[in-house]
Amino acid sequence: MKFIVNSTALLRELQKLNGVISSSNTLPILDNFLFNINNNQMSIVASDLETTMMSSISVEADADGKITIPARILIDTLKTFSNQPLTFIVDTNTFGIEMSSELGNYKLAGQNADEFPKIPTLQSSSSTTMKGEVLVNAINKTLFASGNDELRPVMSGVFCELSSEQTTFVATDAHKLVKHSRTDVKSDNTVSFILPKKPLTILKNNIGDDSDVTLEYNETNALFSFGNITIICRLIDGKYPNYEAVIPKENPNKLTIATSTLLSSIKRVSIYANKTTHQIRFKVAGSELQITSEDLDFANKAEERLSCQYEGEDMEIGFNSKFVIDMLNNIGAEQISIEMSAPNRAGIILPLDGMEEGENTLMLVMPVMLINYYEKNNLNFSPYILHNCKYSTKFNSY
């Protein structure tokens, strides 16, 4: 089998797919790309068994056929070429591959394509369509808040809930939570599932803003298709926590401030915070927000005062600065509102601008303990959203 392909075009497609290939594959053949030629169109497949990604490219071929080629050596070679045609000759008996360029020849060992895992197919699936920029925005708003705890796999992805009224994306790691919804993306069926982190990362890196994305799903898999790309992923099995139960409904204390002003201040003050807790303290009184941090081990301390708009009683509350910085970096608004009720209850961050019609984002961050408040009020404290361990769906009352 012989085929000719443009080096730049091939490299562009392989780099898209390379993110799927795992550094610790259980099957050696998964270190390869699957090339399948049919009528001068070559489909390229990469898989790690959980996520499968496919692309296609035009070639000049003397016959149909398929082969798997080692990913790393092929990409490393293609990176060194200028834009030129490359000729591949495949020995269908030994699976040896000879690649020819304008400057020379390169031999590498392929593997039998029949040994490559079968591409998953979706049976009894439903589908919906959304704009690429809508999906990318939803991923950017939520993915950072997902967890990495192997004991709670349902929290390591993004929960997606589709209905006839809206589509909602939710992510949490038990310390922070993000809920992002769109009323302009709907489904005929009411369904929910948990999308893994890896395919979502690949999606946001490859979807163009002007692309239309088709999402197909059933009980075990989800399929995303756009342009010449198809991504199939296995859904995370399990029941997602009742996230609505942890969102405080009564938040009488409301602070309004410019996102960039608050973000810059927190970044500076957090440098002086304890390196384990990353604790910063908000003290709000009148139209002034005081942000402080302290590291007693090294006698470090910082304080800044910012002007803000505030409605409510004077209060103090502690937060993990890393969580707040993550949220402000991803909220996509110039002005935000922080809604609070008490030092031992979650704070809510809401964007006040930058939202499209039908788009809503809510970010929740759990407080960290302020010793003086809890000693004075004789209160217990937990910085976790979840009440208990492995697959619990119960939230704390606060």
PLM segments and residue spans:
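Structural preference for solvent-exposed beta-strand-turn elements
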Residues: 1-389, 394
